[in-house]
Amino acid sequence: ENRGDGSLDQTADLTEKHVSHGRSSENRRYFRSDKEKHLGGKCMKKKVLAALMCAAMTVGMLAGCGGNSTAGNSSSDAGEAASGTESADSGAGRREMDVEGDDVTTLEVWTFIENHQDFYTNMAEKWNEENPDKKVKLVLSNMAYDDMHNKLSLALESGEGAPDVVDIELGKFPAFMTGDIGLKPLNDAVEPYLDNVVESRLQLYSKDGNYYGFPTHVGTTVAFYNTEALEAAGIDYTTIKTWDDFKEAGAKYKEATGKPFAACETTAQWTLNLMLAQKGGDYLNDDGSLAVNNDTMVECLQTMKDMQDAGAMDVIAGGQPDNEEAYPLYNSGDVAAAIMPFWQTSRYLSYMTDLSGKVAIAAPPVFGDNDAVKTIGGGGTGTAVVASSPNADLAAEVFAYIKLSDTANVEVWNVLGFDPVNTAVWTDKSVTENPDNQYVQYFNTKPFDALLDVQDGIGLLTCYTDEKMPSINNIFCTETLNNIFESGMDVKEALDEAQSALQNEFGE
């Protein structure tokens, strides 16, 4: 998982199939790792591993902790971890703030990304400076991703041992929205910032009109283009406005270079989820029942399949752009474009250093003027307050400041490279165009120009908040997308298989 709230890393590392069905060996060299050239009997092993993981995730959901999300619902925060660059930390770590004074409230905070501890501590220090009569001392515990979410589930169920404040990854959040919700509604704390915060990001962590999580960033899905590679192939990225334009440019690039233009994702759904939202679709019906084989889903996946057939998309190593196997392909210029959440900026700086000054950020392609939305947010980590905390009201006020205030969101951009959820920052050119900022220096366009282009059209898939999503993500990223883009299965047939499997799992 890429929890760089970023993000949930949408990677399903169980399946290593990166061979594009029907591709020549010459083309495969761009997206096959050496260890994958002899698949042989590995296919069966992969299917067994995928099945075991699916079963394990189901058990996890029954235990009340939710499954690991994979696709575009994941977190990107500290790195968002990877995504932000957030790769979830594997071990526990504990630290305490050193706060002077007699009237100081201690808040226990759980995280699964160490970078979040740094950010929260720095912002709590600013809070204490501005609010000397309401000082807080954060005691932060960082745990492995699954360990922390499982521990939280048990603590809320037993009524003992829960923290005051906790980070909950987007893919896990729905599991904490069922039954007696143990988290505090945050509406009052959010209210002072509501006018400037991207509403769709608050909705990710909401139920029945109540907000239960403070978002870390927007994760606006944008397009990243290697302008040097495209110009050499005679392509002007600024002419790419629609998916038809994207397809035409991709086919031209493939013909000119023999290299992939963009990723046909098999271990994530960044592009699919964007298209689905633009078409006004979803994975579920309005009543919450499964509908992964609906007509809109078929249309979107067929659009991607047609792009693959035209040479505009290819299956790449790692199955998606945000993967350690894929970074070298982008860094070397072997793949020219990526449709990804904005937090991918941090990946470029960390893993694609050779592209400094060669990458443009643009609004993503659309189908047309009648699209339901222009883009969506991808990934996320919601910071929640435990309802039973004796300091719940103060904790909510403090963390609303830490996550939503102008001051905090300037640092979200400067330090983490994420697109701030508080859009007041988006128009502050002293921040967004600061020549000393490492992200401003890296990209050859102004990063926030793309965000401003889509500011009035940032939507979401409502299914993100449903407890079925971890299972849906899992089957798409281990079976369905591979069946379509690697095995050449008919789109409707592959989706019907997924629908049947999920209906069996949930008894529908």
Positions of the model-derived regions?
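Hinge/lid segment of periplasmic solute-binding proteins
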Residues: S83-V99, E169-T221, D244-K247, E255, ...
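Conserved C-terminal helix/tail region of periplasmic/extracytoplasmic solute-binding proteins
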Residues: D89, G93, E231, D309, ...
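Short, solvent-exposed loop/beta-turn-alpha elements that line the ligand-binding surface or hinge
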Residues: V99-E100, K184-E199, T239, F261, ...
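Extracytoplasmic "Venus flytrap"/periplasmic binding protein-like
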Residues: K126, E130-V197, L204, E231-G234, ...
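Helix-loop-helix "hinge/cap" segment bordering the ligand-binding cleft or interdomain interface
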Residues: E129, D133-K137, N187, E191, ...
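A structural signal for short loop-to-beta-strand junctions that line the ligand-binding cleft
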Residues: A155, P163-V166, Y193-A229, P260-F261, ...
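Extracytoplasmic/periplasmic substrate-binding proteins
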Residues: A175, L274, Q302-E397
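C-terminal lobe and pocket-closing loops
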Residues: Q344-L355, G368-G378, A384-I475
